[in-house]
Amino acid sequence: MAEFDRDLDDELEFKTSKDVDVTPTFESMDLKDDLLRGIYAYGFEAPSAIQSRAITQIIKGRDTIAQAQSGTGKTATFSISMLEVIDTKHRETQAMVLSPTRELATQIQSVILALGDYMNVQCHACIGGTSLSVDMKKLEAGQQVVSGTPGRCLDMIKKGCLRTKNLKMLILDEADELLNKGFQEQIYDIYRYLPAATQVVVVSATLPHSVLEMTSKFMTDPVRILVKRDELTLEGLKQYFIAVEQEEWKFDTLCDLYDTLTITQAVIFCNTKKKVDWLTQQMKDNNFTVCSMHGDMAQKDRDSIMNEFRSGRSRVLISTDVWARGIDVQQVSLVINYDLPPNRENYIHRIGRSGRFGRKGVAINFATNDDITTLRDIEQYYSTQIDEMPVNVTDMM
């Protein structure tokens, strides 16, 4: 059952365009019957705060900037809107979702297929690290929706396999990351291939001012549904730091923490691939069962690790920020920032992995003497407080 924290919904303050109404039920959104069936079968009962505001605006054809916290149903917001708009009688691609990671693109594909189960919708994950010939075959056969990463989608467009002439909607998920330096040019290149009337939807947990400025280049009079930045700390998440003075002490601190806590599932974040590999080996050498993932791994290995972690066969995942955006594993109760993120926007994406949909979660940050300034900067940016971890932290889990 997919549940949202209703108390959290009530507390959200939307800095929203004036003409945005709240639609309190899915029935009152005037959706297709088969789509409604899919929504209820998926486990949704009533729309979350972002869904009750954004879905009807997107369905009207408005360019939309939607910002909401992790765990409030952003993926379903654009998936439901898109499924309402596409015509399943035609096989050509009518909607494209771009995501910053392969895992997120694949997860979005599975949400779209589940919600569109009774509509017989065709949705393909167009991602790097997979067979080009399979991509080409699937796209040639006709896919109403493509969920992919910018590089592979652009490649397929240039090869003439992903045809955009009938595209109605472009969705940028985790837009802050997509529009950052690494993906900006690819996004602009893709946009040049789209029909002039293509509707653009931008969705993200954080939307820095620079990103909002950038969207003005390819959005027309967008409706804005925004959460004020100081509301972006995640309710129900307890945030702590442990002072470790120097880098060399972090590993012993982690082992001590393991002896103290009973962990359902946890994610440990490091800033580099090298550190992920090193820490994974150290943990295994000390008889801890862990798995790890970073961007250098082959796609089939990353898929296999994600499946293990999602199913609960693996309880601890060590990763770089490749995992930090939008991957929903419902049982994650603890996030450890072995390294504080170098980019403060990524902090909320990392800790947003725990306590999703209103469950309680704990985020623990290892802070060396050199990290204290970064920690205070994160506190100030999100108007939040990160306390030193108490001795009785087990009672908080």
Curated annotation (Swiss-Prot):
InterPro entries: DEAD/DEAH_box_helicase_dom, Helicase_ATP-bd, Helicase_C-like, P-loop_NTPase, RNA-helicase_DEAD-box_CS, RNA_helicase_DEAD_Q_motif. SUPFAM superfamilies: P-loop containing nucleoside triphosphate hydrolases. Residues 236-397 form the Helicase C-terminal domain. It is found in: Nucleus, Nucleolus. Keywords: ATP-binding, Helicase, Hydrolase, Nucleotide-binding, Nucleus, Ribosome biogenesis, RNA-binding, rRNA processing. Residues 55-225 form the Helicase ATP-binding domain. Signal peptide: none annotated. One of its GO terms (biological process) is mRNA splicing, via spliceosome. It catalyses: ATP + H2O = ADP + phosphate + H(+). GO terms for cellular component: catalytic step 2 spliceosome; FAL1-SGD1 complex; nucleolus; preribosome, small subunit precursor; small-subunit processome. A motif (DEAD box) lies at residues 173-176. The keyword RNA-binding applies. The keyword ATP-binding applies. A motif (Q motif) lies at residues 24-52. ATP binds at A68, Q69, S70, G71, T72, G73, K74, T75. The Q motif is unique to and characteristic of the DEAD box family of RNA helicases and controls ATP binding and hydrolysis. Belongs to the DEAD box helicase family. DDX48/FAL1 subfamily. ATP-dependent RNA helicase involved in 40S ribosomal subunit biogenesis. Required for the processing and cleavage of 35S pre-rRNA at sites A0, A1, and A2, leading to mature 18S rRNA. This is ATP-dependent RNA helicase FAL1. The gene is FAL1.
